[in-house]
From Swiss-Prot:
Cofactor(s) listed in the protein's UniProt record: FMN; NADPH; Mg(2+)
Amino acids binding substrate: R8, K9, S97, Q98, R99, Q160
Annotated compartments: Cytoplasm
Gene3D superfamilies: Aldolase class I
Binding site for Mg(2+): E161
Record's function text: Involved in the biosynthesis of isoprenoids. Catalyzes the 1,3-allylic rearrangement of the homoallylic substrate isopentenyl (IPP) to its allylic isomer, dimethylallyl diphosphate (DMAPP).
Binding-site residues for FMN, renumbered to this chain: S67, I68, T69, S97, N126, K192, T222, G272, I273, R274, A293, L294
Residues annotated as signal peptide: none
Name by which UniProt lists this protein: Isopentenyl-diphosphate delta-isomerase
Family: Belongs to the IPP isomerase type 2 family.
Molecular functions per Gene Ontology: FMN binding; isopentenyl-diphosphate delta-isomerase activity; magnesium ion binding; NADPH binding; oxidoreductase activity
EC number, as in UniProt: 5.3.3.2
Catalytic activities: isopentenyl diphosphate = dimethylallyl diphosphate
Species per Swiss-Prot/TrEMBL record: Methanosarcina mazei (strain ATCC BAA-159 / DSM 3647 / Goe1 / Go1 / JCM 11833 / OCM 88)
Amino acid sequence: MINTTSRRKIEHLKLCAESPVEARQVSAGFEDVTLIHRALPELNMDELDLSVDFLGKRIKAPFLIASITGGHPDTIPVNAALAAAAEELGVGIGVGSQRAAIDDPSQEDSFRVVRDEAPDAFVYGNVGAAQIRQYGVEGVEKLIEMIDADALAIHLNFLQEAVQPEGDRDATGCLDMITEICSQIKTPVIVKETGAGISREDAILFQKAGVSAIDVGGAGGTSWAGVEVYRAKESRDSVSERLGELFWDFGIPTVASLIESRVSLPLIATGGIRNGLDIAKSIALGASAASAALPFVGPSLEGKESVVRVLSCMLEEFKAAMFLCGCGNIKDLHNSPVVVTGWTREYLEQRGFNVKDLSLPGNAL
């Protein structure tokens, strides 16, 4: 029998594949970011080095296929396609929340298939902050072992939990548990927002807690509050529907969140990454890697080759952006100046950041 968590996972996958679930009136902010064009790059585009060391593992490009799904039998071919594409192109990949496999161990194969199809890739596990108090360190270690994970993402989806009728709305004690997990396990821990962004205040807390990386998961991409609107309509839950509509675009946009989160930790830029230029802008703004989920949902339902086609295009766009900025490797792009204008600049200046420093050589706030 399929449990509630497993059923919800397949509902989420279908909604993301078939319904408009992206932000409506808020943007990730990449239109406010201008890379500095070098008219004479003095580089051979075919010889650029896109590879990077990320949390102890070398990947061929600074990109991760973000957590999408798992926990239902129908998700096995989806995760297999995603993982096989990641393995072929040498990028990283995350699994969806492994909660369903804790509730029902028969669902483990829907997650384990990722490591089976991507034996050499950077693979991260995934569990919600609301669940780690229940699972404890021992339970978290089981999730890591399940997929031989290179890292574990603890996702922060309290916006979705607040909207979801069956959501877990108790966030007390999560930071202490994150701190305990970081001190007890050897595997790197990533704290991952899921669409509402990370503030400066929280980035500092996570750094003190001992996490290894922060995935900013900013507003401007998939809205999980929006996803829950469709579920609420289906169940005729008018309160949850109203909450989801109101908070559809809530949160800190991705670009602003990247700047907010610039502490001495690797950053992952997620939220509205839709092309290689977005990836390049993210790296120039300080991210160690970028990631996306929604662009691969539809292709993953078609199979590996469709995922490879979409991802290859994004990576070629990324390479072109590096070339046109005169950057031969990722370190060069990290130090490449950028100009931030518009709403994003206004927001960041009101938050106390001097964005003009980003436009200077060295690109340091």
